[in-house]
Amino acid sequence: MENSNPLAKIEDVSFRYPKSDADALSGVSLEIPRGSFFALLGPNGAGKTTLLRLLCGRFAKFSGTIELADDVRGANAFLDPIACGILLENPGIYPKLSINEYVDYFVGFYAARIPEWNDAEARERIASLAKSLELPSLDTRMGKLSLGNRQKVQLLRAMAPAPRLLILDEPVANLDPMSRETVWKLIADWRRQEGGTAIVCSHILAEMEEEATDFAIIDRGHVLKSGRVADIASETATFRVEVRGNLAAGKTPESLTPEKIRDILAAAGIEAEVAPAQSSLSRLYRETV
């Protein structure tokens, strides 16, 4: 996958957790296009979260290289926490803090490090995000929130500084279908309005693929496939044959083209339509993993 101005370029990255006898990641090479919705796919334990943690600078020792664009790179050569909204699995909460107090903690962190920070604009943005996410009163204590609302608060916190990049690990975990739809729309609107880039892991592929522009399928630490979602149809072209009448069972050689199939059936007096079958990220995932 090539991009003239990628936001991140990962080359031959391998990583092994201490005391483990197997690599969590092995020879991973990817490019994250700027402005993309990058879907990181794979079964549990595939290495998706490990890769996100590496991008976030959680592990300093690994082999290979990770190159980041200047506008998202921090002083330590890893992602700048100011330019990036990060939501990893199982974030800690402070049960005695209200939503407002919890978010205020991070607002203070951002305000101290972003020279152009405008507190009034930030407050307006946070209020708008809270409304879009249908959160309860911001005076509600974190410990009294449902798991779904805690997840929404974490997304609010990640989006509070108007980041250029979102890294989201299972952003719709513990959410009901309507809330999941709200979250996907919020991320899509942010991308369109801000030109941001999102790197997202989610097990609910059928929902995520509606917004995904690029993808990588990882299993057992290896990248099995990656590319642009728009290219899937041309790379995995198959055809559906709709037969009107009875067709005797038999083997169909792979070399048969749609035209040949249509001609053979027509010669046998069978009317049929041969049309491209709809290819999708979900289908490619099922065929790959």
Identify the role of each PLM range.
Residues C56:
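Helix-to-loop junction immediately C-terminal to a conserved catalytic motif
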Residues M1-I10, S14-G27, N76:
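A short, flexible loop at the N-terminus of ABC-type nucleotide-binding domains that lies
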Residues G64-D80:
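Conserved ABC transporter NBD signature motif
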Residues L166-E170:
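Catalytic Walker B motif of ABC-type/P-loop ATPase nucleotide-binding domains
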Residues L41-P43:
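The feature captures the beta-strand-to-loop junction immediately N-terminal to the Walker
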Residues D104, G108, D119-S137:
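Conserved ABC ATPase "signature" region
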